[in-house]
Amino acid sequence: MGSAEARLTLASTSPQRRAILEQLAIPFEVVPPDYVEDDPPDADAVELVRRHAEGKAHSVHIEGRITLGVDTTVLLDGRIYGKAADREHAGRILRELSGRTHTVVSGVCLLGGSTDVLEHATTGVTFRALAPEVIDAYLQSREWEGRAGAYAIQGLGGRLVEGLDGDYLNVVGLPGALLVSILERSAPKLLQIPR
């Protein structure tokens, strides 16, 4: 594969991950992963996101291609917060995150580069103390649907945040700094700036 044809296969249907790759000018194609996430109740968040990222990448990987799998979750007091099942569940999650600092953890798996890589990134996110009417208004927006931790920092969910410690893009859904570091080591041709 020549550098003009170099393209990453993204094992994800996430519009946020696509937008981040576009922002970073990394050429890619999307292939929805054929992977079922199983979340044991006693799972370690880092092990979980790494396993899911690897499973997603392997589910679509074709020899000779470079494939990226990513998984993101939210962690507070040792408890994993995935996507809310419904509005009531989303409200419960937001009340628990209110006024506290939680951790966003993403696993990143790259297959098919000079070496296969499986790493993770963490970002601390502090929510301001949320009044019930703020939570209700956010729930009405439905932006929480399909989001780890029941919020989207890049949208209205940014209003809920007081501070950030780490990579903002990780909270959106793909740790950009970690991805660039991995690509520099394993697939630098994907980082060539288009002319």
Language-model features: locations:
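Cofactor-binding loop segments of dinucleotide-utilizing enzymes, especially the Rossmann-like FAD-
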Residues: 13, 33, 113
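Residue-level marker of intrinsically disordered, low-complexity segments enriched
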Residues: 18, 28-29, 102, 191
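N-terminal beta1-alpha1 ligand-phosphate binding loop
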Residues: 2-25
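Short, glycine/serine-rich, charged loops/turns that create anion-binding
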Residues: 15, 35, 176
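Anionic-ligand binding patches
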Residues: 2-9, 42-195
